[in-house]
C-alpha cells in the first residue's frame, strides 16, 4: 500500500498514536498517548504484524512477564497480548524482512483490572514496505547484527558458542573452520544483511565473467572471502594494508597477500599504509552485468562481519562504480599523502544516483581540502536531533568531540550516541536528559532474572560504526558515514572512504540503527552498576497502593524520556 519510510495509524477512535519507521532489516514502532497521561490501569502495548501477502498476524514476544501470584519470575517469552511492551517504542526484526510488499502492524493498548485480568482497547494499524534494498538498484544500507552479547544470541546458540564460531586470534583466521553444528545459521544471523549483501556482490562478480574487480582492505582474514577472490584470477586487483600488526609474515593479511600474489601476479596486488593506515573497506565490480561498489565501516574479517556493530553501503550503477574505480587507481598510483591528496578522489564527488543526494570522497587529504572541521561545523548546526555511533571517539579529540560536547549544553537538541569506550566530558546521563552516550557492555554480573549471562565476543572493539545522523526528522536530514573515524588522522593521513547523504529515508534507517544499539547497551550499563542494578525484571502491574507508580510515570516526568516519546511518534 505504501512505499513511504514513515507511516502512521489512522484510527481516530484509538486513544494513542502509532508511527512506523522503515529501517534496513528492521522497523521502529513508536506510540504516544493522545491526551495527557494514560489511565493508571494501562499496562502496555500488544504488537502484532503480518507479512506481505500473509493471512495471519503474529504477536511479538516479550522476554519480561508479570509476576506470578507468589511473585515468581516467569522464564518464558510470551505473546505481547499477554506480556505487553511497557515502552513507547520498539525496534522489530521481522523474520523475513526482505520480502517485497506491505508489512502490516497492529498495536493494541492493554489494560489490567484489580483481579489482574487483561482487556484490550481500540487498536492502531498501519502498513509499511521494508524490502531488502533501501533504494532498489541504486543504494542499499546494510548492517551487521553486532549482538553476540545479547539474550537472543544466548537463546539461539548458547553462551559458550563463541570459541566454536570464531578463531582465537586474527592471524589464524584464514585457516579457521567453525565447529558449532549449526555454524552456518549462526554466521548468517550474526552477519545479518551486511554479510549477505557483500557476499552477493562478490558472487555476482564471479558470475559476470567480464567484470573487473578492485578491493582495498584493512583487516582481512575471512576464508569465505579469500576463496571467492581466488576465483577472480585475471580480473582482480587488490590493495592490502601493511601497517602495525598487519605487516608481520605471520599476519593473516600477509598470508592472504602471499597466496594472492602467486595467483594474480605482483602487478595486480600491493601493500600500502598511506601516511599511517590504509583503512579503507572498499569493493568495486565493473562488468557488463554487475556494477557495484561497497563502502562503509565493515572490515573483511571475522570480527568485522560477526562480532562488531558495522555498516556497509552497496552502490549500484555506472557513476558510483566509475568514481570508486578512479579512487582505486589513485591509491594504486600514490602511496603517499602528498600525491593522493592532489587527485580528484580526495574531493567530494556526486555519486550520480538519480533522485538521491549522495556524495563521496576519499582520504588522505591535504590541509587545504580537509573536511573534518566542516563536518564538525555541520554537526554544530543541528536544530532538532543528533544520533551518532562513533568508534574511537574517546581517543579522537577535535572538531567532532567539540561539536557534540557543545550540543550537550543545548536543551533544544535531542541526542543519543554510542562509542566503543566512555568519552571524557560526555555523560552517560545528563540531568536535563537531552544528550546521552553509551558504550558496549555485556550482562556478565548483577544478572537480573530471567536474563542469562552473555558472551563478550572476545577481546577488541565491538562497536565499530562510524556514522552521524543530523536532524533525521527534518527535510534537511543528512548522514555522514564510511570507514572515516572523524579524526585528524582519518582526514589527512589514512586511506578512508566517507559519504555524505542528504536523504531522509537513509537518515531514518541510520537513526533506527543508533536507537537499537543505544537501547541494548544502556540497559547493560545500568546493570553493571551494582547500586543501580535490578535483581529481577518483571512487568509492572497497575498501582495498587498510594506510593506505587505506573510503569509509564518516568516517560512523563523525565526530560529525556518525554522528548523520546514525542520525537518518534
Model-derived features: positions:
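PLD/PLD-like phosphodiesterase catalytic module centered on the HKD motif
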Residues: 2-184, 199, 207-212, 226-307, ...
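Acidic/glycine-enriched edge-of-secondary-structure segments
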Residues: 170-192, 348-366
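A Trp-anchored, charged/polar loop motif used as the substrate-binding/catalytic surface
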Residues: 191-201, 363-377, 395-402
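A charged, amphipathic alpha-helical module
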Residues: 335-378, 382
Amino acid at each position: 500500500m505504501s512505499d513511504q519510510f514513515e507511516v502512521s495509524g489512522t484510527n481516530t477512535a484509538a486513544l494513542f498514536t502509532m508511527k512506523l519507521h522503515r529501517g534496513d532489516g528492521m522497523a521502529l514502532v513508536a506510540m504516544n498517548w493522545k491526551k495527557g497521561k494514560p489511565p493508571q490501569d494501562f499496562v502496555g502495548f500488544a504488537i502484532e504484524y503480518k507479512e506481505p501477502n500473509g493471512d495471519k498476524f503474529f504477536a511479538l514476544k516479550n522476554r519480561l512477564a508479570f509476576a506470578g501470584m507468589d511473585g515468581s519470575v516467569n522464564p518464558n517469552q510470551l505473546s505481547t497480548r499477554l506480556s505487553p511492551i511497557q515502552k513507547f517504542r520498539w525496534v522489530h526484526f521481522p523474520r523475513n524482512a526482505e520480502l517485497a510488499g506491505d508489512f502490516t502492524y497492529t498495536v493494541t493498548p492493554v489494560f489490567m483490572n484489580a483481579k489482574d485480568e487483561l482487556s484490550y482497547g481500540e487498536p492502531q494499524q498501519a502498513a509499511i514496505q521494508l524490502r531488502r534494498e533501501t533504494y532498489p538498484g541504486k543504494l542499499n544500507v546494510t548492517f551487521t547484527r553486532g549482538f553476540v552479547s545479547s539474550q537472543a544470541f544466548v537463546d539461539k546458540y548458547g553462551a559458550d558458542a563463541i570459541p566454536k564460531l570464531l578463531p582465537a586470534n586474527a592471524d589464524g583466521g584464514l585457516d579457521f573452520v567453525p565447529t558449532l553444528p549449526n555454524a552456518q545459521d549462526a554466521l548468517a544471523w550474526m552477519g545479518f544483511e551486511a554479510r549477505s549483501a557483500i557476499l552477493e556482490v562478490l558472487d555476482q562478480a564471479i558470475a559476470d565473467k567480464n567484470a573487473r574487480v578492485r578491493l582495498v582492505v584493512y583487516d582481512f582474514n575471512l576464508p569465505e572471502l579469500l576463496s571467492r577472490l581466488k576465483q577472480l584470477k585475471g580480473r582482480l586487483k587488490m590493495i592490502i594494508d601493511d601497517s602495525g600488526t598487519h605487516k608481520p609474515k605471520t599476519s593473516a593479511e600477509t598470508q592472504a597477500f602471499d597466496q594472492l600474489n602467486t595467483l594474480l601476479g605482483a602487478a595486480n596486488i600491493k601493500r600500502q599504509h598511506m601516511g599511517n593506515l590504509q583503512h579503507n573497506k572498499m569493493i568495486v565490480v565493473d562488468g557488463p552485468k554487475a556494477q557495484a561498489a561497497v563502502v562503509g565501516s565493515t572490515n573483511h574479517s571475522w570480527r568485522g562481519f560477526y562480532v562488531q556493530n558495522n555498516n556497509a553501503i552497496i552502490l549500484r550503477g555506472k557513476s558510483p562504480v566509475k568514481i570508486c574505480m578512479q579512487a582505486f587507481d589513485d591509491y594504486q598510483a600514490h602511496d603517499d599523502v602528498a600525491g593522493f591528496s592532489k587527485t580528484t578522489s580526495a574531493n567530494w564527488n556526486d555519486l550520480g544516483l538519480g533522485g538521491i543526494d549522495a556524495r563521496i570522497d576519499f582520504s588522505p587529504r591535504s590541509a587545504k581540502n580537509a573536511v573534518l572541521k566542516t563536518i564538525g561545523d555541520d554537526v554544530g548546526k543541528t536544530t532538532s536531533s543528533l544520533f551518532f555511533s562513533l568508534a574511537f571517539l574517546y581517543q579522537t579529540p577535535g572538531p567532532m568531540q567539540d561539536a557534540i560536547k557543545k550540543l550537550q549544553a543545548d536543551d533544544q537538541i535531542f541526542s543519543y550516541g554510542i562509542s566503543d569506550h566512555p568519552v571524557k566530558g560526555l555523560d552517560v546521563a545528563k540531568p536535563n536528559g537531552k544528550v546521552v552516550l553509551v558504550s558496549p557492555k555485556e550482562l556478565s554480573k548483577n544478572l537480573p532474572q530471567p536474563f542469562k549471562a552473555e558472551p563478550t565476543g572476545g577481546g577488541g572493539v565491538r562497536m565499530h560504526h562510524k556514522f552521524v545522523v543530523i536532524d533525521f526528522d527534518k527535510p534537511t536530514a543528512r548522514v555522514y558515514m564510511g570507514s572515516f573515524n572523524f579524526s585528524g588522522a582519518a582526514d589527512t593521513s589514512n586511506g578512508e572512504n566517507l559519504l555524505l547523504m542528504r536523504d531522509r529515508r537513509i537518515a531514518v534507517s541510520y537513526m533506527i540503527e543508533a536507537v537499537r544499539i543505544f537501547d541494548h547497551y544502556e540497559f547493560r550499563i545500568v546493570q553493571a552498576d551494582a547500586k543501580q542494578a535490578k535483581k529481577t525484571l518483571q512487568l509492572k502491574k497497575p498501582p495498587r497502593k498510594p506510593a506505587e507508580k505506573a510503569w509509564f510515570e518516568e516517560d512523563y516526568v523525565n526530560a529525556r524520556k518525554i522528548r523520546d516519546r514525542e520525537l518518534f511518534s
